[in-house]
């Protein structure tokens, strides 16, 4: 809630991403006294065939609530749907980001501000400090984050 208040004080509506962002958006919206909705990955195949659920008026200032950002693809799809509906998307608030270069670049190119509660570097450092993972595991995870298409990190090769 603090991130949304501080980074997006003019927010009028919170929109969760389907499915994992919905409960987080609901909680934050309730705490802030804001309306909330969510965006499906695609329109329903019955009823009104809505992709956006919840009341959204053209021109309203929206913050998208997401659980995790990796490459940015799914959250950018949501932003696109909202913009097409006439919303002014102020940005995205997520719980976690890997900080993958591909995701950061895509968000920047789409002019989408992103604020996360935590990130890969913090989680990896705390996990290593608390001895949940070993230093070599951190190195492997960094290789994944920096180049997810290269699966050599899985086998533990250095």
What are these language model-derived features?
Residues 80-158:
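PRPP-dependent phosphoribosyltransferase catalytic core
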């Amino acid at each position: 809630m603090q991130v949304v208040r501080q980074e997006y004080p003019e927010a009028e509506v919170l929109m969760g991403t389907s499915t994992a962002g919905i409960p987080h958006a609901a909680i934050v919206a309730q705490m802030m006294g804001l309306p909330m909705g969510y965006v499906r990955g695609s329109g329903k195949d019955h009823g009104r065939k809505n992709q956006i659920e919840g009341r959204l008026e053209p021109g309203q200032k929206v913050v998208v609530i997401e659980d995790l950002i990796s490459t940015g693809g799914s959250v950018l799809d949501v932003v696109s749907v909202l913009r097409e509906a006439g919303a002014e998307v102020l940005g995205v608030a997520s719980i976690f980001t890997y900080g993958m270069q591909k995701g950061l670049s895509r968000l920047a190119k789409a002019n989408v501000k992103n604020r996360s509660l935590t990130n890969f570097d913090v989680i990896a450092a705390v996990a290593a400090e608390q001895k949940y993972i070993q230093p070599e595991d951190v190195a492997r995870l960094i290789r994944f984050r920096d180049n997810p298409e290269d699966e050599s990190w899985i086998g533990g090769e250095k």
